[in-house]
Design a protein with these regions (language model features):
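A glycine- and charged-residue-rich anion-binding loop/surface
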Residues: 1-245
Length: 245
């Protein structure tokens, strides 16, 4: 669900940086390299604009808000609504990142693994292991593969399953990450299968298009590719490709 009603856990009269904790929330908190959802929280006497959400070590979701009107009190009942367009923009970038990793492995080799990533509504960065600069020709091949998969309109499925079952399917995990006995797996028709807790499109066609605008070294043996979110989701992102070792 994207709308839930609950009671908040703190009083606040400030206008900026208001922190709100709900018993339940439809908002995705920043984690796993994915930016948090945006949206609004409303009550009988207040309107709050949600600008960030973080999950504490104890499992509380803390919403950082701007109080646009009114005042909030302990015991108020609020309705939380996620900005669907903002979430979809992030989902496009996140699914595109999965396609990118699979394409990089196809072009550069199976030694390629994710070393870090970041996705918000505007951009995606993807850090990956590789022993040398990626050539312009290789990047063109990678980009074409990703766009081919987008235009093939491949279904994206999300399932929770025992970790051993996920491993048998060949699902890729983030190196160094600790997982429980049950994991969430994002699969793109068997072409890309990864452990992932983020938000995704339901079909690759929803991404619209893909263009790598830069590739560079960020550390020894670690490369970074960068891709902006297109202003028009039905068209590939514009920009240029820049390369440096």
């Amino acid at each position: 669900e994207e709308t839930l009603t609950d009671a908040i856990a703190t009083d606040e009269q400030a206008k900026e940086g208001v922190l709100v904790v709900l018993d339940k929330t439809p908002f995705y908190a920043e984690m796993g390299g994915q930016a948090a959802d945006h949206g609004v929280i409303t009550g009988a006497e207040c309107v709050l604009r949600v600008q960030d959400v973080k999950k504490t070590p104890k499992g509380y979701y803390v919403h950082t808000c701007t109080l646009e009107s009114g005042i909030v009190h302990v015991g108020d009942h609020l309705t939380a609504r996620v900005d669907k367009e903002y979430r979809m923009a992030i989902a496009r970038n996140h699914t595109a990142t999965h396609l990118l990793q699979a394409a990089l492995r196809e072009v550069l080799g199976d030694h390629v693994h994710q070393a870090g990533s970041y996705q918000d509504a505007s951009i995606t960065h993807f850090d990956f292991t590789h022993f040398s600069a990626v050539t312009p020709e290789e990047l063109v091949r990678v980009q074409k593969i990703v766009n081919d998969k987008i235009f093939e309109s491949m279904n994206v499925t999300v399932k929770e399953m025992p970790i051993e079952e996920a491993k048998k399917l060949g699902a890729m995990a983030l190196f160094g990450e600790k997982y429980g006995k049950v994991v969430r797996v994002v699969d793109i028709e068997g072409w890309s299968t990864e452990f992932c807790g983020g938000t995704h499109v339901k079909n690759t066609a929803q991404i619209g298009g893909f263009k790598i605008v830069s590739e560079s070294s960020v550390a020894a043996g670690i490369r970074r590719s960068h891709r902006p979110q297109p202003a028009d989701p039905c068209k590939p992102a514009g920009g240029y490709a820049a390369y440096r070792g």
